[in-house]
């Protein structure tokens, strides 16, 4: 586990927040800066085929150290952090041997409380890395990067651990849904892969949401308020009417497990035009289609009731549930389970209430389930990770490489 924490702390110091309003890839220059750093580290580890392409994708390969044929496996993590909270000037703090109670985040009023985050009660005695309460931490997904590189370094330093080819990929812009857009599966060279992008220890995921974005555009008419009678149509009022037509019990804060939702994620209001940005999620493809039909029906209903003004709906499919692409390859899941069990980690198979690069890659011909990092509360200032969880992830990655080699002897 040499240098694992040091690597992680180094990577979170890079500002790599992605930006959905930018069309180029990567969407922010900071991701290229981190990519250059990772490329240099992989070269220092004497990996082969190390490459940073013009779109910010980093790839490399640890060659097999066995004579028999073993399918090449891939390990993937993303370099960007979520736009939901600042990732600039991250100041991690390490709480050693956590003994319970609130953890003060920096010098402000923010705390990490076991009342609000009960998972903390399971982590007594652990060493926890938190934020200072002003930014996210970046464990999503820089912990995955640190764990992959540490595992590869361990395999390099211990040639007695047998393994086949291991392909490494670090992607940009995952948090804005574009991480797989320009990923070259053929060049990557793996038969299957794992994203190291999950949460608490034991998570193993090969199901994710089907996802659609829904832009509701409400059109009004702007007139000077002093002469607006019978002329002005305030699009914000139309937008408010639409939001009130949506089911209040089918939102992220009211759903769990396999339940889908509608989520109003953004608003751009003005009198003349208001844009509502929704995301629609459902684990069942048919359920997603029904949700899209429901939203269109509400748009039609609202339009029919308006004497002035109008509403339009733009639906864009983002990604689909990888289960249909991964299930035919059950050995991929079984190998991950065996690796976890061999490391005294109980596999916790659950659906991802979100998406990963692996979801898209699975539909591009690279089956790609998701493995834990040891982190919690991603995308916000209460994000944290345990050092022990990170170490477990490294052990599982190493064991996964070893188990794959053994299986194909």
UniProtKB/Swiss-Prot annotation:
Chain residues that bind Zn(2+) 2: 140, 175, 379
Keyword Cytoplasm set for record: yes
Disulfide links within the chain: none
Entries under CDD domains matching the protein: M20_peptT
Major site of localization recorded for this protein: cytoplasm
GO terms of biological process kind: peptide catabolic process; proteolysis
Localization of this protein: Cytoplasm
Protein name: Peptidase T
């Amino acid at each position: 586990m040499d240098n694992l924490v040091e690597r992680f702390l180094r990577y979170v110091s890079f500002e790599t927040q992605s930006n959905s309003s930018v069309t180029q890839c990567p969407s922010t220059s900071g991701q290229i800066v981190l990519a250059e750093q990772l490329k240099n580290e992989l070269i220092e580890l004497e990996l082969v085929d190390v490459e940073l392409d013009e779109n910010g994708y980093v790839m490399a390969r640890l060659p097999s150290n066995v004579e028999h044929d073993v399918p090449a496996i891939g390990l993937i993590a993303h370099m960007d952090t979520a736009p939901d909270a600042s990732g600039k000037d991250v100041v991690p703090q390490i709480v050693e041997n956590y003994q319970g109670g609130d953890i003060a985040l920096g010098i402000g009023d923010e705390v990490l409380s076991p009342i609000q985050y009960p998972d903390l009660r399971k982590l007594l005695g652990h060493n926890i890395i938190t934020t200072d309460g002003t930014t996210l931490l970046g464990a999503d997904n820089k912990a995955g990067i640190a764990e992959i590189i540490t595992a590869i370094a361990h395999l390099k330093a211990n040639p007695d651990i047998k393994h086949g080819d291991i392909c490494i990929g670090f992607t940009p812009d995952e948090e804005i849904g574009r991480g797989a857009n320009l990923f070259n599966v053929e060049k990557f060279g793996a038969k299957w892969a794992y994203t190291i992008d999950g949460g608490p220890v034991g998570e193993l995921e090969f199901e994710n949401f089907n996802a659609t974005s829904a832009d509701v555009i409400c059109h009004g008419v702007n007139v000077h308020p002093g002469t607006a009678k019978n002329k002005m149509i305030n699009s914000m009022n139309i937008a408010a009417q639409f939001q009130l037509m949506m089911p209040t019990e089918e939102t992220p804060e009211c759903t769990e497990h396999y339940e889908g939702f509608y989520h109003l994620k953004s608003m751009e209001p003005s009198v003349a035009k208001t844009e509502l940005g929704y995301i629609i999620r459902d684990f069942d493809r048919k359920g997603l289609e029904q949700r899209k039909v429901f939203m269109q029906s509400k748009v039609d209903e609202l339009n029919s009731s308006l004497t002035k003004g109008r509403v339009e709906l733009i639906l864009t499919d983002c990604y689909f549930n990888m289960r249909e692409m991964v299930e035919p390859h059950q050995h991929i899941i079984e190998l991950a389970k065996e690796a976890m069990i061999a490391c005294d980690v109980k596999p916790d198979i659950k659906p991802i209430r979100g998406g990963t690069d692996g979801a898209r890659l699975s539909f591009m011909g690279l089956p790609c389930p998701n493995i834990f990092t040891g982190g919690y509360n991603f995308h916000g200032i209460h994000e944290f990770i345990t050092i022990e969880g990170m170490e477990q992830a490294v052990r599982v990655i190493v064991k996964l490489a070893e188990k794959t080699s053994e299986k194909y002897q």
